[in-house]
Design a protein with these regions (language model features):
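Hydrophobic or amphipathic, alpha-helical segments that drive membrane association/targeting
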Residues: 1-149, 166, 186, 191-250, ...
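Cytosolic-facing loops and C-terminal tails of multi-pass membrane proteins
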Residues: 4-8, 225-250, 269-503, 515-619, ...
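Active-site recognition of the HExxH zinc-binding catalytic motif
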Residues: 121, 160, 175-183, 187, ...
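Envelope-exposed proteins and targeting segments
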Residues: 133, 154-156, 297-299
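Membrane-embedded segments
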Residues: 141, 158, 163, 169-175, ...
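Short alpha-helix carrying the canonical HExxH Zn2+-binding catalytic motif
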Residues: 169-185, 498, 502-507
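DG-centered beta-turn motif at the end of beta-strands
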Residues: 179-180, 260, 316, 504-509, ...
């Protein structure tokens, strides 16, 4: 199943889940309404304490306003409780991690094990094309577990327990993080965080019952006894509804966990890493336990489940290990777990030594990296298989992971050692937009002073020399690593930053592709993070024909200096997407202003329509037989806007600009 099929299946599954939860809530509300109607009948004085079912029905028939009022009241209580929980989690995955006692892992951490965790997450981020998520460690959790949370990749966070950080080797940690990244890529986080809100609403019913019990427990009156009976019924109903919701939740979660395991192995090409992590947990009963008070809220998010049978949110360890190793025999689980412990110690020590050496290198000047020399443009050979490129979306491979490690190690020392503070991240981002032309640069720095103050201008000027040395291949990957710091900006600061970015880009009266891509990615991340927006995926290709024409025209124009060849490239690609009817080739003089809103509207395409669109874009780009860095960056930006993250499609090491390669057939 490819990324688009998984997205379509996830949407279908989400709809069924919403219907199932709505049915559960409706049943709970119906029973609650009947109970409270009975209480109203009793309190009216028309009936004795022992109320027959027919009497309640008669009362309901003659007092419909009472029934409606109780139904609306209980529905409102559940929905408002769910809404309040959702609003509490609006900040995304970081809020979930913080609620469990998590601590943010900073870029400049000196703990080798946390440094290793951070490195693994950074590499996965670069390889998958997903903005760098926040990284958290649950310091007080000795069990081995992890989770990814957030509304979308723009506000995602990955949290790992201290037990996992202390116990797992690098390859095992990679397997776990790959598993969590698959949840980010497949849209599981959004469903999980919505589930937290819905289940909280059902839990609130039981909470109301407990409150009534505490308030009425001391009363010996008949009224007090009646209230205790009512409160007990509320507790039972609330938790029965919650149990039903958790059964639904667990059934959905188990399928998602199987898919995440498979995606992790596809990502790392090392089933032994994920297998080792599972054996580390299976070898010690209860070793995946989370002790935080809110652990039940996130049970469906965890890498390993602590719940059993009907409520198990994960397949059994035996089933998960057997999927990775068909020769596995369930009875050998304890022996394999013990063997894993005995073989891991020396490997782990060697691995930690390598991570420690990287920490020491942070304080030394870079000697040879991709930052040496002036930035370069490049072209590359790329087997042009539009279907193959489109299928890479959401499916990073081992080669992408290896390339990501090269990119991470090639980043400037100054960038690698800076902390995730919002101020430093903002400085590095703005430095990427400062022109080399002295006149334009002076104008931009004046804009910066006006918007952020003289001290911020001085901070940006301080990092300008390093930013100027940054190789073109590394500019956007470096920007993606800044997002955890940028997310710490307050709402007003983000709006100021986004406005300043727009002014800096327009300072020279033109927009190049890098500037457009940077501006779009930052807008996409910060604005989506603020609004927690996600595309609905309901439009087909025909309904979006106008926006598709704008996109293909810009891609063709930017990749071909000759107008005739640009038109041919446009026709070659768009005919694959809209074979029957399509707009003629026209390019707006202000291509960036036309493209930005078109991309925003195209987010709402159906998953399989997005696949066809990406295939057509690759055909247009490949028309001249070359893939340039600006074209590759624009394609990845388009894919990111469509919420279809594309792994790197150019080699990690820059190709000398004098060399030209012919794209494969």
């Amino acid at each position: 199943m490819d990324f688009y099929a998984r997205q379509a299946a996830a949407r279908t599954q989400s709809r069924w889940l919403v219907l199932a939860l709505a049915a559960s809530i409706a049943v709970v509300v119906a029973v609650l309404t009947w109970m409270m109607t009975a209480v109203s009948a009793f309190r009216s004085g028309d009936y004795l304490l022992h109320i027959r079912r027919s009497s309640v029905a008669e009362f309901a028939a003659t007092h419909p306003q009472v029934v409606i009022s109780w139904a609306l009241l209980w529905t409102a209580i559940i929905l408002l409780a769910s809404l309040s929980k959702s609003l509490m989690l609006r900040g995304g995955g970081g809020d979930v991690a913080r609620s469990l006692g998590g601590t943010r892992v900073e870029r400049d951490t000196r703990d080798p094990r946390l440094r290793r965790l951070r490195n693994v997450v950074e590499e996965m981020s670069i390889a998958s094309g997903v903005p760098m998520p926040e990284v958290w460690v649950l310091e007080h959790e000795s069990g081995i577990n992890a989770f990814a949370a957030g509304h979308n990749p723009a506000n995602a966070a990955i949290a790992v327990t201290r037990g996992a950080v202390a116990t797992l080797r690098r390859d095992e940690l990679q397997g776990v993080i790959g598993h969590e990244f698959s949840h980010i890529l497949n849209g599981d986080m959004r469903l999980n965080i919505r589930l937290m809100g819905a289940l909280f609403g059902l839990m609130m019913i039981g909470g109301i019952g407990k409150t009534i019990i505490r308030m009425s427990g001391a009363s010996d009156s008949r009224r007090g006894g009646a209230f205790l009976i009512l409160a007990g019924a509320l507790v039972v109903l609330g938790y029965l509804g919650l149990a039903l919701g958790r059964i639904i939740q667990a059934a959905v979660s188990r399928d998602r966990e199987r898919l995440a395991d498979a995606s992790s192995v596809q990502f790392t090409r090392n089933p032994n890493g994920l297998k080792g992590a599972l054996l580390a947990i299976a070898g010690v009963p209860g070793s995946s336990t989370i002790v935080a008070a809110d652990r039940e809220d996130i049970a469906h998010m965890l890498f390993a489940s602590g719940m059993q049978r009907w409520f198990a949110t994960h397949p059994s360890f035996e089933e998960r290990v057997r999927a990775l190793d068909p020769s596995f025999v369930a009875g050998r689980l304890p022996q394999l777990a013990e063997k894993r412990v005995q073989s891991s110690n020396q490997d782990d020590e060697d691995d930690l030594l390598a991570e420690s050496n990287q920490i020491e290198m942070l304080t030394k000047p870079a000697t040879a990296s991709l930052t040496a020399g002036a930035p370069r443009a490049a072209t590359a050979s790329l087997p042009i298989d539009p279907v193959g490129i489109a299928l890479q979306v959401g499916r990073p491979q081992t080669a992408h992971l290896d390339q990501a490690r090269q990119h991470r190690l090639a980043l400037p020392v100054e960038l690698r050692q800076f902390t995730d503070s919002s101020g430093q991240a903002r400085c590095w981002l703005l430095a990427q937009l400062i022109s080399r032309d002295a006149t334009v640069r002076g104008r931009q720095l004046d804009m910066l002073s006006e918007a952020l103050g003289q001290s911020e201008r001085a901070a940006v000027e301080l990092v300008l020399p390093v930013a100027a040395r940054l190789d073109n291949f590394l500019r956007l990957p470096a920007v993606l690593q800044l997002f955890p710091g940028l997310r710490r900006l307050a709402r007003a600061e983000r709006e100021t930053l986004l406005g300043l970015i727009e002014r800096l880009i327009l300072a020279d009266g033109r927009i190049d592709l890098f500037e457009f891509c940077l501006g779009k990615l930052v807008n996409l991340s910060l604005r989506d993070e603020l609004g927690a927006r996600t595309a609905q995926g309901s439009d087909n290709l025909q309904s979006a024909a106008g926006d598709i024409a704008v996109l293909f025209a810009v891609i063709a124009q930017q990749g071909n200096s000759d107008a005739v060849e640009a038109r041919r490239a446009y026709e070659a690609g768009i005919s694959r997407v809209l074979p029957m009817e399509r707009a003629a080739y026209t390019v707006s003089s202000n291509w960036a202003a036309a493209l930005a809103p078109a991309l925003t509207r195209l987010q709402n395409l159906q998953p399989f329509a997005k696949r066809a669109l990406i295939e057509g874009l690759v055909v247009t780009i490949a028309h001249d037989g070359q893939l340039t860095l600006p074209e590759a960056e624009l394609l990845r930006t388009v894919c990111a806007t469509l919420q279809c993250p594309l792994p790197p499609i150019l080699p990690a090491v820059p190709i000398d600009e004098a060399l030209q390669f012919t794209l494969g057939e």
